[in-house]
Structure formats: structure tokens, C-alpha cells
């Protein structure tokens, strides 16, 4: 015999972005609860609207399985005295298991007799276990929480009702002043309370009260309605997945509608129109058959088609007000030159402990120039980069960005184009913010990429200089994201980026240019270096590189980021080779024996005592001449070829000879080889089987 169990949490409207993850969390914790309580079950349907989270569990077992188990107790010599009487230990053990000493049997384990009790545990019924679901409800976590009434209890929103039905029977539970029952709520305006006769009635009963509880069905309905409106008007609609998800979690009974705005607003930059409609009002913008934006939008109301004309008029009025403001700001911004806006950045603080935004831009310009030389940019790209670096933050003081902060960079590109800046300069202004998330798009242009790296590295050096270093989960200036972005960009272009050396070089360049702003860039250089190495680890882990290889390639504090990434890829590419194990063992042996050794003598080949010493040294010298500055596949193959000479060397040579001169000479030779191996990190940490 199996059952259906319905559990619903009824709340005030939740923020849209919380609904889907909260439902998944509710499901996962319920599955864990059932598993912990040994209650078998079938499929679990998940339901959610802004006002509710609900689960319908199918084929729920009537009860737990009856269990028989043997419980081990103390040794026989402890359980009985010399006369065979039960001791307090035996009596207490049996009482604790709900049994008596008469139930005790003995079993021999490795020659020792132990007390055992055979227990038959009758399974609890589902009805007896399910009140524990209250703990699952209480355990849900949310990004923000609130209290209500006089209660100390916190939740995403106040809970107004609970439904807990095992088939047609209420499973009792109480949270604060809310008793679980069989009554749920229909649509806030169109429906009424619904008393459920059975858990299976849930979906149909709420649909009759203008609530579609299945998220997928509701989303499909929204999509179908939007596509129908678009077809009727011959529009193209970008059915953005994130916006569709958000709108879906704002409504219980969706009705899509079309609205319009004055054509004159199409003169506003498209990015502003999209932001106003999509981000601010949650509308879907429309294009004609040629892809040109039209003065129309599609919205979704939480209700039916009654009085839809009033709804449309209200939405059009709100959007028109936003667009009127945008048009005004757009006109005002064009009254000033880029030079005017750059000068105004002197009054804009980057951070009160660091400098103005104007000074930050000046530092970034110095860094960008230095990086351009290292990365081998052309003269044209260098000129474009220098121009972009001298103005790239100017849009921060524009009225449009003040009203729409999410358009910073985008408006900078647009205004730069209007002012006649070269396309490469304008594009770099937009791209310097990228990537805007851990897995966000990287800049497409070389100029934009270098500007993005320079800007982010200036931020890192500056915040570390004033000891504003991320700790734990605290990272208010998104420095981890910026550092991660730098590593991703370096990886894409395989550009050299030796963090430790680069910090010193940049600090010297800024000092020479008079652009340090009294910042002590030497204060936390080692901390920033380690910080960047950690981000390289993250990038490699995201590429599914083995943890031991990641650890091996990131041990060098002075390592180049590109070199770290290349070494990891090369080692990972060969990890399944049949000869990988002996190669790593041979190279690792060299690193282990030279670890912490400091030898200040030159290699004297006259002190070699066997042929293997000369053979390995000659091979090392020849390999060093062909080695690149950073790890390459050819370098790996060269080291691989040294595996046999290394093994032959150790078979014939006692490195730590009693004669100090011989020992120092051998270590000096091995240290030269170790320096080559260390291009790939500490390969002795690579796990081989």
C-alpha cells in the first residue's frame, strides 16, 4: 500500500529570484528526510508560485520496513562475574536496548566472547514520521530573511498557511500560529480559498482558482502567449531565458499583452531602450522582420484579460516616463565633450583610501603601456590603447550612467563613437569591464583585453597597497572576480604575466611617472602574488585538471601565470601515457634530493667519477640551450628523454658523498637540471600509480 503526500508552504510574495532555488532546496531536503527515515517513495512533483512552495510525493511507503539487527555489547568477561551472574554492565546494556539479560546470546569474535542482543524493530508508519517535515520547512535557507509579528523566527517572507495531506488525512504540524490543514489559497484577486479533499486534487483545484502551480506549464503558457502576440504583429521577440524565468516567478495566472511607446524614443540608444524595458520593467522588447527595434513591447500581468486595456495604458505610462527621462539625459550628455567629462573624474572617488577615478585612470594608462610592450601589440594597437586608457572611465559622470549604472562602458562606447573616436578605442571602453562574471564573455579585441587587464590589475595593486584584502567570504570590491578574469584573459592569449616581477616593474614605472598617489605598492606584494596564484588554481580546477597536477604547477611563488597554465595542460595531456609514471618518478627524484640545497660552486666535470655523471650533465646542458622561457610540449619531451639518464645516474652515483667537494659538485649539476624541471613546478607532487 502506498500513498500520496502533499506539503505546501504558503507565503507572502517571494522575490522572483528566490523561488526556483528555494523549491529545489525544499525538494532536496525532503528527499534527504525521507532517506534518513527509511521511507521509500516514487516521483516527487515540484510546484511553486510567488506565494507558495509545494511538493507532491507519489508512491510513498505506508511504513518503514521492519528491521532485525544484532546489537553488540560488552565482552562476556565484563557481562558476567566469576559465578556467571549478570553484572551491572550487562543489565544496563540490555535495558538500554529495551530488553532483559534473558535475551542475551554470546558470539565469539577473534577468540573473544561478546554479548549480543537480537532486536526486531517494527517500522514506523508514514503518518507517524511525516510531522517531522516541519523541521525541513524550518531548515530552508534564503539569501535574505525577515521576522514578523512578535516572533523571533526568520524566513524569506511571512508564512500564512500550511497544507499537509497524506492522501485525504491531515498530517498535523504547527509553525508559530499556523496549523497545517487542507486549505490552500487561490489567486490573490481572482480566486478564493480551496479546501482539498485529497492530496491528488491539488493541481486541478488550484487551476480552478486561477493558479497554475506547475512552473514549467506556466512558463510554456507565457512563451506561447508571447509568440502568438509576436506572430499577430509580425514581430521578432528575444525570449530571454533569464527574463522569462523571472516573469514566470512573478505570476500565478499569466496573461501577456502588447504595449507601445512613441516612435521618437527610438532615437535613444538601443541599449537604453532594452535596459528600460527588460531590466527595469521586465518587458520583452520587439523587432520587425528586418531586426530593427520597433516602438512596442510585450508584458505579462498576473491576472486574466479583464480590464486589460487599463493595464496596458498603465504600463505604457510608466515606460514613457522612464524613456522621457532617458531622452533628457541623452541630450544633456551630448552638450559636453569627452575632455569635459574626463576632467570631472577628478571629483569622483575611486576609493577614499586610494585616489580619484581620474588618478586611477592615469595609473591604468601607465600599466597598459607597459603591458602592451610585453604582449607584443602593434604600433596601431598601442596608440589606440593609449587613447582608450586616457578616457575610458569618462561615462561614469554622464547623466545616462547615473540613471542606468548597468550601462557604464556601453554608454562610453556609444558616446565615444558620437565624438568621432576610432572604433577600436570605443570598443575597448565597453570591453574593459569584461568579464563581468566568473564565466562571463571575455573582450574580443586585443586593445580591449589589455585595457581590461590593466584596469583590473591596478585595482588589485591599489586595494592590496592599502590593506583592503579579501578575507574569507568578504570581498566587497570583487577582487577575486577581477583576478580570476585576468587569469582567464592571460590564458586565452598565452601572454606572459609573472605577477611578482610585474608588480615591481609597474611600481617603478608609476613612480617614474609620478602616478603612485602615495600608495605603498610593496606592502603586500607577496600577498597579491599568492592571491593571483590561487585564482590560477581556480581556473585550472574549472578545466577539470587533476588536483595533484594543479598543486604541482602552482608551488613557485615567482611563476608566470601563463607558464603555470601551460605546464598544467601539458602534464594533464600526458597523465595517461604509459611512460608518465617513470618520467615523473625520475624528475621528482631530482627535485627531492636538491630540495633546500644551496650550492655556490660551479660544476667541475673533472670531479665526475663515473660515466653516468658526465652523460646526465651533458644532456642537461644540451637541453637547457633548447629550453623556452615558459613550458612547452618540446620542453616536456626533452625532460622525458632525460628519464633514463637520470635513473642510470642514481643507480651509479651516491650524490651525498662523504667528500664535500664531490657532494657539492654533484648537487650543483643536479640543481641545474632541477631548474629546468621546475618550469613545470614541483612534479614530485604529481600522484602516479
UniProtKB/Swiss-Prot annotation:
It is an enzyme of class 6 (ligase). The keyword Ligase applies. Its main location: cytoplasm. Its EC number is 6.1.1.14. One of its GO terms (biological process) is glycyl-tRNA aminoacylation. GO terms for cellular component: cytosol. Keywords: Aminoacyl-tRNA synthetase, ATP-binding, Cytoplasm, Ligase, Nucleotide-binding, Protein biosynthesis. SUPFAM superfamilies: HD-domain/PDEase-like. It catalyses: tRNA(Gly) + glycine + ATP = glycyl-tRNA(Gly) + AMP + diphosphate. One of its GO terms (molecular function) is glycine-tRNA ligase activity. It is found in: Cytoplasm. It comes from the Bacteria. The keyword Aminoacyl-tRNA synthetase applies. It holds the Pfam family tRNA_synt_2f. Belongs to the class-II aminoacyl-tRNA synthetase family. Tetramer of two alpha and two beta subunits. This is Glycine--tRNA ligase beta subunit. It comes from Lacticaseibacillus paracasei (strain ATCC 334 / BCRC 17002 / CCUG 31169 / CIP 107868 / KCTC 3260 / NRRL B-441). The gene is glyS.
Amino acid at each position: 500500500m502506498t500513498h500520496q503526500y502533499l506539503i505546501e508552504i504558503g507565503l507572502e510574495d517571494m522575490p522572483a529570484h528566490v523561488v526556483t532555488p528555494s523549491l529545489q532546496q525544499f525538494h532536496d531536503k525532503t528527499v534527504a528526510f525521507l532517506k534518513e527515515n527509511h521511507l521509500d517513495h516514487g516521483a516527487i512533483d515540484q510546484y511553486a508560485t510567488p506565494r507558495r512552495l509545494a511538493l507532491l510525493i507519489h508512491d510513498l511507503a505506508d511504513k518503514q520496513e521492519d528491521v532485525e539487527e544484532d546489537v553488540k555489547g560488552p565482552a562476556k568477561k565484563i557481562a558476567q562475574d566469576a559465578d556467571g551472574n549478570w553484572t551491572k554492565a550487562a543489565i544496563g546494556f540490555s535495558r538500554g536496548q529495551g530488553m532483559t539479560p534473558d535475551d542475551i546470546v554470546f558470539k565469539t569474535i577473534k577468540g573473544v566472547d561478546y554479548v549480543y542482543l537480537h532486536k526486531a524493530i517494527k517500522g514506523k508508519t508514514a503518518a507517524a514520521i511525516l510531522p517531522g517535515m516541519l523541521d525541513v520547512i524550518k531548515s530552508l535557507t534564503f539569501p535574505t530573511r525577515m521576522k514578523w509579528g512578535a516572533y523571533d523566527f526568520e524566513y524569506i517572507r511571512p508564512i500564512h498557511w500550511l497544507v499537509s495531506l497524506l492522501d485525504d488525512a491531515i498530517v498535523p504540524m504547527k509553525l508559530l500560529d499556523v496549523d497545517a490543514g487542507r486549505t490552500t489559497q487561490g489567486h490573490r484577486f481572482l480566486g478564493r480559498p480551496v479546501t482539498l479533499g485529497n492530496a491528488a486534487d491539488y493541481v486541478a483545484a488550484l487551476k480552478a482558482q486561477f493558479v497554475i502551480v506547475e512552473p514549467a506549464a506556466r512558463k510554456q503558457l507565457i512563451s506561447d502567449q508571447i509568440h502568438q502576440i509576436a506572430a499577430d504583429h509580425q514581430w521578432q521577440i528575444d525570449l530571454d531565458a533569464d527574463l522569462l524565468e523571472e516573469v514566470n516567478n512573478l505570476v500565478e495566472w499569466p496573461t501577456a499583452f502588447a504595449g507601445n511607446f512613441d516612435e521618437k524614443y527610438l532615437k535613444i540608444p538601443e541599449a537604453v531602450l532594452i535596459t528600460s524595458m527588460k531590466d527595469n520593467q521586465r518587458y520583452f522588447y520587439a523587432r520587425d522582420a528586418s531586426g530593427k527595434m520597433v516602438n512596442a513591447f510585450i508584458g505579462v500581468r498576473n491576472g486574466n484579460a479583464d480590464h486589460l486595456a487599463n493595464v496596458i495604458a498603465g504600463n505604457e505610462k510608466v515606460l514613457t516616463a522612464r524613456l522621457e527621462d532617458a531622452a533628457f539625459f541623452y541630450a544633456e550628455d551630448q552638450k559636453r565633450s569627452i575632455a569635459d567629462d574626463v576632467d570631472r573624474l577628478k571629483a569622483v572617488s575611486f576609493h577614499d583610501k586610494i585616489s580619484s577615478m581620474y588618478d586611477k585612470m592615469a595609473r591604468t594608462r601607465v600599466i597598459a603601456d607597459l603591458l602592451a610592450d610585453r604582449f607584443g601589440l602593434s604600433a596601431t594597437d598601442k596608440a589606440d590603447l593609449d587613447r582608450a586608457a586616457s578616457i575610458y572611465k569618462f561615462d561614469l559622470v554622464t547623466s545616462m550612467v547615473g540613471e542606468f549604472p548597468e550601462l557604464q562602458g556601453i554608454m562610453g562606447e556609444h558616446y565615444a563613437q558620437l565624438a568621432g573616436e576610432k572604433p577600436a578605442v570605443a570598443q575597448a571602453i565597453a570591453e574593459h569591464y569584461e568579464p563581468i562574471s566568473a564565466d562571463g564573455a571575455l573582450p574580443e579585441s586585443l586593445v580591449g583585453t589589455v585595457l581590461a587587464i590593466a584596469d583590473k590589475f591596478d585595482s588589485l595593486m591599489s586595494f592590496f597597497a592599502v590593506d583592503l584584502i579579501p578575507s574569507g567570504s568578504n570581498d566587497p570590491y570583487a577582487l577575486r572576480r577581477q583576478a580570476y578574469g585576468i587569469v582567464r584573459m592571460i590564458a586565452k592569449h598565452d601572454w606572459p604575466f609573472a605577477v611578482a616581477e610585474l608588480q615591481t616593474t609597474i611600481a617603478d614605472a608609476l613612480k617614474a611617472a609620478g602616478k603612485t598617489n602615495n600608495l605603498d605598492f610593496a606592502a603586500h606584494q607577496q600577498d597579491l602574488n599568492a592571491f593571483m596564484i590561487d585564482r590560477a588554481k581556480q581556473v585550472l580546477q574549472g578545466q577539470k585538471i587533476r588536483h595533484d597536477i594543479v598543486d604541482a604547477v602552482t608551488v613557485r611563488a615567482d611563476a608566470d601565470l601563463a607558464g603555470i597554465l601551460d605546464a598544467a595542460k601539458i602534464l594533464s595531456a600526458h597523465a595517461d601515457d604509459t611512460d608518465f609514471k617513470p618520467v615523473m618518478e625520475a624528475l621528482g627524484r631530482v627535485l627531492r634530493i636538491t630540495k633546500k640545497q644551496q650550492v655556490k660552486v660551479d660544476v667541475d666535470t673533472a670531479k665526475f667519477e663515473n660515466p653516468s655523471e658526465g652523460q646526465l650533465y651533458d644532456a642537461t646542458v644540451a637541453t637547457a640551450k633548447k629550453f623556452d622561457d615558459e613550458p612547452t610540449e618540446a620542453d616536456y619531451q626533452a625532460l622525458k628523454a632525460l628519464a633514463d639518464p637520470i635513473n642510470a645516474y642514481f643507480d651509479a652515483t651516491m650524490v651525498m658523498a662523504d667528500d664535500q667537494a664531490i657532494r657539492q659538485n654533484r648537487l650543483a649539476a643536479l640543481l641545474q637540471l632541477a631548474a629546468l624541471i621546475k618550469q613545470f613546478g614541483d612534479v614530485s607532487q604529481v600522484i602516479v600509480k
